[in-house]
Amino acid sequence: MRRTVARIGLVAALALSMSVAAATAPPANADDNVGLVSSARSAAGLMNYAINLDSNVGESEMASAADLIPSVGGALLTSYPQLGTLFAQSESASFAPDLAAALAKAGVSVHSIGPTRVAAVPESERAVGGATPADPAAAPAAESAEDGPVAGEPAADAPDVPTVTIPDPNSRVGSAHSNWGAEAMDARGAAEVAVTRAPVTVGIIDSGIDDTQPDLVGRVDTARSVSCAVNGVPNQAEDARRFSREHGTHVAGVIAANHNDIGIDGIAPEATLVSIKALNESDLLYPEALVCAYEWATTHQVDIVHNSYQMDPWVYWNPTDPEQAAALEAAERAIHRAQSSGLAVIAGSGDRGVDIDHPTTDSDSPTDSTPIPNRSVEGARMVPAQVSGVVSVSSVGMEDWNAEPLRATLM
């Protein structure tokens, strides 16, 4: 295994950086031979779908599934033979049951088929009628590794570019509280311990990273960075992977900001960052983007994956609801494959102050449409925080914001 040690300090850093899904049809009684399949939608409209074949399918079954998608009014978006999963787009209201029937007739066993969201796919992301299926592991690089920055080596001079300061609402200007998280866990003291640190690459699945920010110059490997935000199709073009909001940059700074007497000091300033943009322009992270992000991390030598979000549009995903099961299954397959490849997966469990191990109701979902009040979520789970094997952490704060962070009681 190439992935080894020296990541404990990063786990603490990632933990402190975490703070950052309409109305559905009732569950369908899918035929036992074709698994869980969502009902026909009430009206036609542009929608993306997750399609999971049985886990033991081979290349021929995957090829058959891909070939059948256009015959029922769909367009293939991405195919992951290693997962037994495909994503497709269609305007047909009956796409899911029609595809399930076609696959059953062809002798292809299906685990689940269902939508990845509640709101319709925007016209700007239309793929039906001319989509070119993407190979998620082989997206063309926007630049070669030789042309991009040398990972892990900060530039001698920071570029003269406008920067954005993101204040901590609980900080006191000019005090240690502006970096209170690092102070609270005595990160500086830990960094002074003389140990040999293994080189670590952290994939940040988020809104993208501003790699021109002086605190992050040299930290981001742009040759391995990507956007998965549109239909879960990997795109390394600079304008695609450019950060859409500041959250990903904030997280990157907590983890690996250069120690350069400006801004904050990162917990692991020698770490290499890979920006995996997965939030779309509406600040939503859909299942197809998550699967793309994990497959990218798995195939691009990432050691740790940081997740400061919950997968949209459901805060809690129900594995027995055919409207949610397929997207959940696809996400878990991708996460488990990453874990089996040696990636450590760290995820935030939110900042709602609730017991996510025993959820009862949820009034915040779906996040892309009008939320359903008091939706029953017993037996449902948050993704990725509650996926088996994921290290889940919640946000914390100081009980007394006037106290010194190192000695403060955290809550």
Task: Set out the residue ranges of the language-model regions.
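Short glycine-/aliphatic-rich beta-strand segments at the starts of folded cytosolic domains
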Residues: A43-S55
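Active-site core segment of subtilase-fold serine proteases
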Residues: A158-E270, C292-A326, P359
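Autoinhibitory propeptides
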Residues: D32-S39, S55, A63-A176, M398-D400
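Secretory targeting and sorting signals
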Residues: M1-A30
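C-terminal region of N-terminal signal peptides and the immediate post-cleavage residues
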Residues: S19-A43, D261
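Substrate-binding/access-modulating region of protease and related hydrolase catalytic domains
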Residues: A278-V383
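Extracellular S/T/G-rich loop segment that most often corresponds to the catalytic His/Ser-adjacent loop
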Residues: S369-M411
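Loop/turn elements at helix/coil->beta-strand transitions in domains of secreted/extracellular proteins
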Residues: V108-S109, A198-T201, P269-V274, T299-V305, ...
